[in-house]
């Protein structure tokens, strides 16, 4: 049983490192240097691709825990926020520019989805709840 917990923590930390690297690469290469040179539509595509990459990494790693509520929450939050981003993005593509306030909301949602914050929070909840359940059993 001790070996299983070590492997779960190792897998979780590895996922956190990969998400942090993706997050850093986005900010270094696409947010600061590359993005000013491309059109608005390609910015949307780049942002969407990075959200999907982080979503895929999180899904792959969190699936290893075999905790149904955690995967449901992960999928639910991503479906809701990605849907909101898609609606805002499609409106921006087809009806012209969106207001700065809506753009700030979209940027905040995007930042939340690609940052390691959600992944970390879910991991902390899992390890705390798992630890509490283990201590109740003993």
What function would you assign to each model-found segment?
Residues 35-44, 100-113:
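Non-cytosolic membrane-interface motifs at loop->transmembrane helix junctions
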């Amino acid at each position: 049983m001790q070996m299983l917990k070590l492997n779960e923590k190792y897998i979780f930390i590895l996922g956190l490192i990969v998400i942090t690297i993706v997050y850093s690469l986005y900010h270094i290469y696409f947010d600061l240097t590359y993005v000013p040179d491309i059109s608005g539509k390609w910015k949307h595509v780049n942002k969407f691709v990075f959200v999907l990459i982080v979503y895929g990494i999180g899904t792959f790693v969190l699936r290893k825990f075999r905790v149904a509520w955690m995967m449901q929450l992960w999928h639910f939050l991503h479906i809701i926020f990605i849907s909101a981003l898609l609606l805002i993005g499609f409106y921006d593509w087809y009806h012209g520019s969106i207001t700065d306030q809506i753009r700030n909301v979209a940027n905040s949602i995007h930042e939340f989805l690609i940052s390691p914050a959600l992944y970390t929070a879910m991991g902390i909840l899992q390890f705390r709840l798992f630890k509490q359940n283990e201590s109740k059993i003993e």
